[in-house]
């Protein structure tokens, strides 16, 4: 019996939840956000079903820019793995992205997920970026002096940051991409201006970064610094947590360079390697 792929519907959310609860050691998030995804423009959620029309696979594709698509949230019911659903959903998502103007489709995989890496390479993807997902709790040491701390920056600061970053090894390692949480697309000068307007663009003698706050801490999407200045920037990032309530944590997506991982680990960050794969359409 062959499975078919169709667009997801609101009633599929409750049917997907039981077999996605143990995807990771901490659970899963897809059933909590899938309902919202169904209503997002430029986004498609698909499911795999058999004759009973009960979802046993799911995936999402979305346009992050007019020419860039991102594929994520691929899940297959444990009893239906190795059935070809993963590759079939990927192909379906890629076709949808191409029809909607995308010229490249990308996705992220943790470096130690050999099965997923093998699958995307067989599908024609190539490795286009190595990143570090870095997390840390609030610093317990001395707070930085006023002149060393991160503070909100303005348009002039963003201009300097962009000029510096565009010529840096961080930009080269990032392939000029910016993190949108667990999604990536090509960065633009406008991203920094948006951050200035949202009061999420910060500067210090150690460099510049975009840091967004939520109920659990701070998330860093983009940063610009140099090897000698990186320690001060990272210290300043942890220092920002002192102004957050509860027991906040900081998470940062940082391109892998010859020095970036060491700078993070020296300041107590736990680092998980992430790889970005892309497919030209």
List each language-model region with its residue ranges:
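Active-site rim helix/loop that mediates acceptor-substrate recognition in acyltransferases
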Residues: 13, 20-47, 55-60, 169-201
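Charged, low-complexity intrinsically disordered regulatory/assembly segments
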Residues: 174-281
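Conserved acetyl-CoA-binding loop-helix of GNAT-fold acetyltransferases
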Residues: 76, 82-95, 118, 122, ...
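Conserved GNAT acetyl-CoA-binding A-motif
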Residues: 97-112, 119, 245-255
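Conserved catalytic-core motifs of GNAT/GCN5-like acyltransferases
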Residues: 63, 108-110, 126-140, 270-281
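Short amphipathic alpha-helix that is part of the acyltransferase structural core
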Residues: 1-32, 140-183
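Conserved beta-strand in the GNAT
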Residues: 54-62, 70, 75, 203-213, ...
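Conserved active-site tyrosine of GNAT-family acetyltransferases
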Residues: 119-121, 125, 262-265
